[in-house]
């Protein structure tokens, strides 16, 4: 999904060679789809401990500012990042999430941000955006 922040930023950096970012200090939390899948299994195995509770799924180490994410992507793509001080991002989400509750049960993420960025970049290299049926999974 290219509408997700990391995927969108990496795509623009690779396609255009630059990225303009507003509100660089806004915080977001991230999780890799593989870790989400692992959490489903974790939940099924720990249903008796988790029943009737609500959990944030992720890891405290995955709370990043937009600037931190951009700097990681820039190092891997050599794209120019411009942090614009004037203007606004239409997406006003700015938050840090605590994952202490699920961590206390033994769940934590395994895929770090930089590994996820590497995967996105490698996928973007093989996707033919002119072909509706291109899917990196087949390469």
Where are these regions (language model features)?
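Flexible, glycine-rich beta-alpha linker
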Residues: 1-4
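C-terminal substrate-binding subdomain of Rossmann-fold SDR/epimerase-dehydratase oxidoreductases
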Residues: 13-139
